[in-house]
A protein has these predicted regions:
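Polybasic/polar functional segments that serve as interface/processing modules
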Residues: 1-82
Length: 82
């Protein structure tokens, strides 16, 4: 049996830099998307870069979702694979 794999990456622009540098809010966002998609979170990891920027990810039983931010540019990329 072969599983169908789906992957999507979304670029989000003109985002408030404070949000893009808030690890708790970004993890909450990932969890909300996971729940809305009826997926199942297993583990989370977050890395805060200096002086700014965050990479955060949730390992899902179906695969993963991640966000990478550049607050200085107001940009984030959200990637999900299931």
């Amino acid at each position: 049996m072969h599983a169908a794999v789906q992957s999507i990456t979304i670029k989000v622009s003109e985002v408030d830099s404070a949000l893009l540098n808030d690890a708790d809010e970004l993890q909450k966002l990932l969890r909300n998307v996971t729940e809305l998609a009826d997926l199942h979170s297993l583990e989370s990891v977050t890395h805060q870069f200096s002086p700014q920027g965050i990479s955060a990810a949730l390992l899902l039983s179906e695969s993963h979702i991640a966000i990478h931010t550049w607050p200085e540019s107001g940009v984030a990329y959200i990637a999900m694979t299931t």
